[in-house]
Swiss-Prot record:
A family per Pfam: Nup88
A molecular-function term among this protein's GO annotations: structural constituent of nuclear pore
Known role: Component of the nuclear pore complex.
Name this protein carries in UniProt: Nucleoporin 88
Ranges in coiled-coil conformation: 584-611
Subcellular location: Nucleus, Nuclear pore complex
Organism: Danio rerio (Zebrafish)
GO cellular component, one term: nuclear pore
Major place of residence: nucleus
Tissue: Widely expressed. Higher levels of expression are detected in highly proliferative frontal regions of the embryo, e.g. brain, eye and anterior trunk.
Biological process annotations from GO: mRNA export from nucleus; protein import into nucleus; ribosomal large subunit export from nucleus; ribosomal small subunit export from nucleus
Length: 720
């Protein structure tokens, strides 16, 4: 029941009125080349799903947590965010700022920033739950795009700092990256020229077209994680400044690097460093149709370079050594700066259109279909990212990153072992959605893509199709890192788990997973056009043949291999079990014999101990007799004699004291007897005097008794 309650919002979102309204106005959208481009018009923020309506130029938003609440979900309730100054261009992408207060509306002919309204009320809705809300919009570089008709916007991202003022970074077709502050959206706060020409002041449209044909124009860029400014000594920056590395990708596959700090009070930035050397070297420089770059925020940084032909290059960013900072970066070096190098750890080819099986007499022909690819980070896993393009959606998981991290920490310098590591474990590529199964199929690119990172809703991929159909797909759980175990679940010394499991680097389960890993899958296929019309029989036959081949090669055959491996494992474990049972029987016999031997040894030990004590007593007596016959006193005997002399002196002194006491006693007795008779008649004592005299006599008697007792004890102690 808990799983059904967690899936309630998924069923409600598919049938939401937002998508019904968008599907009804689908025919009103402009028809043109933009329909062939994969867009991203949706995002999630604090459990709210936002979808951009290109016809009305508004945002529709609904709360996913409320759809997941108990009771019947209200699929007709949503809020509409109106733009006070709607964009005049067609929006292809929406980007939420790092501070989550602004949303950038990106198109090929401009950019506009929408400021999100405030939240209040019981359900924390925008402006207390109003149905329609006017939102402030800020056009960015509007005058620049209006005056420059031939310049198009290639890419736009937010500056990644959350503590500084929000800045929107734009890459335009004139090989320039501009940083715009929202307080002054018409004039750039920073300008970075990324042209490979020495003098860019006289560049015209024809020159830019020549540079584009040669692949010398910047096509994409991405910010890396926060850099440590003290290591950038050549930049002459203060240690407290926030510095981000900026990776710039050109169409010919070259990558350049620049360090950006908006706290630096310089209006224009210097030339980027590059091209960054790539190892191992390739004749085609790893592609000539690069289109996207993504820096994964892990250590070491992984740079993903995508080409329009569907190739993905996973490059490890390695710090440069002193002998490597010449040659390749000589033209672009600035002072004593050193540029890092890119080690191409892995090359992956995406299956853009489905590869159809060839007949017996047919030759396998390579598909020449190409399209731009857009890369998306995964908020739940740093080692995973996603690709959206005209032909569908792919997910890529870097399962080898942990082994690479261990290899880099081991300080090994053997490049062959690094290549063996790359060939040992490949990344996992999952074909999630196919919107163009064949190269001659009509385009149907996705209109929205997002990963729900709210764990209360569950890790889910949201895909909005070209017909505004909401697809909710599960993520590949084998890539996402497992949650840490509870403290109470840690196995102790008495755990039933085998100690041999810790000796193996990879478990048998991981071995089976590697066998079952699929190089190609049967994705969820969507086709454009009328849903009621059936595809041609030839296309159906090709797709059926392809699905059959994938099921045969990637499922049935690999399941057979896994079955054989498991049978081999069972046979091996059965043999080990029989051998261990035999060893256990031998151990029981050995334990029984050892117990009997221990009992015999215990008896012998007791006998030997008794004999040893008897011998020790005899030795003591013999030594005592020998010591007594020696003419010279030992040290202990001398001490004993001295102690006896001291005791004798003390006894003599006490004897004298006793004699004196006795003499005093006799004298006092005589005195009492002599004066008792004459004084009896004449001397009379009163009661008080009699009492005092009795007390004195009693004290003297007690004193004498104590002395007598002390003398008696001394005599008893020394046996006198």
């Amino acid at each position: 029941m808990a799983s059904l309650a967690g899936d309630r919002w998924r069923e409600a979102l598919k049938n939401h009125d937002i998508f019904n309204n968008l599907q009804e106005r689908l025919h009103l959208e402009p028809q043109g080349t933009s329909k062939r481009i994969a867009k991203n018009l949706t995002f999630c923020l604090n459990g709210d799903l936002f979808i951009w309506d290109s016809v009305e130029s508004v945002f529709y938003t609904t709360n996913l947590r409320q759809l997941n609440s108990d009771g019947e979900p209200d699929t007709s309730r949503y809020q509409t965010l109106l733009c006070i100054n709607p964009p005049l261009f067609e929006v292809c992408q929406v980007l939420v700022s790092p501070s989550q207060y602004h949303v950038a509306l990106i198109g090929q002919r401009g950019a506009t920033v929408l400021e999100l309204p405030q939240r209040w009320g019981k359900k924390s809705e925008f402006e207390g739950g109003r149905i329609q809300i006017n939102c402030k919009t800020i056009p960015v570089a509007e005058r620049f795009f209006t005056s420059s008709a031939s310049v198009t916007l290639r890419q736009a991202v937010w500056y990644p700092s959350e503590t500084e003022e929000p800045h929107l970074v734009l890459l335009t077709s004139d090989n320039t990256i501009r940083f715009y502050n929202l307080k002054e959206p018409q004039s750039p706060a920073r300008v970075l020229s990324v042209s490979q020409m020495d003098d860019d002041s006289s560049v015209h449209t024809r020159s830019r077209s020549y540079a584009a044909s040669l692949g010398e124009t910047a096509v994409a860029f991405d910010f890396g994680p926060l850099a440590d400014s003290p290591h950038l000594s050549s930049l002459r920056m203060k240690a407290e400044l926030v510095v981000y590395p900026l990776y710039i990708l050109y169409g010919n596959g070259e990558t350049f690097l620049n360090y950006i700090s908006l706290s630096h009070s310089v209006g224009s930035l210097g030339k980027p460093m590059g091209p960054l050397p790539m190892y191992p070297a390739a004749e085609d420089n790893y592609g000539y149709d690069a289109c996207a770059v993504l820096c994964l925020p892990c250590v070491p940084n992984i740079l993903v370079i995508a080409t329009e032909s569907g190739m993905l290059y996973h490059c490890v960013v390695l710090e440069a050594e002193e002998e490597e900072d010449g040659g390749a970066v000589e033209r672009w070096s600035r002072g004593s700066e050193t540029a890092p190098s890119l080690y191409v750890f892995e090359c992956v080819e995406l299956e853009l259109t489905l590869k159809l099986p060839a007949g017996e007499e047919e030759e396998i022909t390579e598909s020449d279909f190409t399209c731009p690819i857009r890369l998306h980070r995964d908020p739940l896993c740093q080692h995973r990212y996603h690709c959206t393009h005209e032909a569908g959606v792919h997910s890529v998981g870097l399962t080898w990153f942990k082994k690479l991290h261990k290899f880099l920490e081991s300080d090994e310098e053997d490049k062959d072992s690094l290549q063996e590591l790359a060939a040992e474990q490949r990344c996992i590529v999952e074909h999630i959605l196919c919107t163009r199964p064949l190269a001659n199929s009509l385009p149907a690119p996705v209109r929205g893509f997002w990963i729900v990172s709210d764990l209360s809703l569950g890790a889910t991929m949201i895909c909005i199709t070209s017909t505004y159909e909401c697809l909710l797909l599960p993520l590949l759980s084998s890539i996402r890192p497992a949650s840490p175990p509870l403290l109470c679940s840690h196995p102790g010394a008495g755990s039933d788990s085998s100690p041999l499991r810790g000796l193996a680097e990879d478990s048998f389960e991981q071995h089976i997973r590697n066998i079952l890993a699929r190089s190609s899958t049967n994705p969820l296929m969507l086709r454009s056009g009328d849903k009621d019309s059936s595809p041609p029989p030839s296309e159906c036959l090709q797709l059926l043949s392809r699905a059959t081949q994938v099921f045969r090669e990637e499922y049935i055959l690999k399941l057979g291999l896994a079955h054989e491996e498991m049978q081999r494992r069972v046979k091996l474990l059965s043999g080990q079990k029989n051998k261990q049972l035999e060893d256990l029987a031998l151990c029981r016999e050995d334990r029984k014999s050892l117990t009997e031997a221990a009992e015999r040894l215990a008896d012998k030990y007791e006998d030997a101990k008794y004999r040893q004590e008897a011998i020790m007593n005899r030795v003591k007596r013999v030594l005592g007799s020998l010591r007594s016959q020696l003419p010279v006193l030992s040290d202990s005997e001398k001490d004993m004699r001295k102690e006896l002399q001291t005791i004798n002196d003390q006894l003599r002194h006490l004897d004298n004291g006793i004699k004196q006491v006795n003499m005093k006693k006799d004298y006092q007795k005589k005195q009492m007897n002599a004066g008792a008779s004459p004084a009896h008649s004449s001397l009379t004592l009163n009661a008080h005097q009699r009492k005092c005299l009795q007390g004195v006599l009693k004290e003297q008697g007690e004193h004498i008794a104590g002395m007598m007792k002390q003398i008696k004890d001394i005599k008893n102690h020394f046996s006198f």
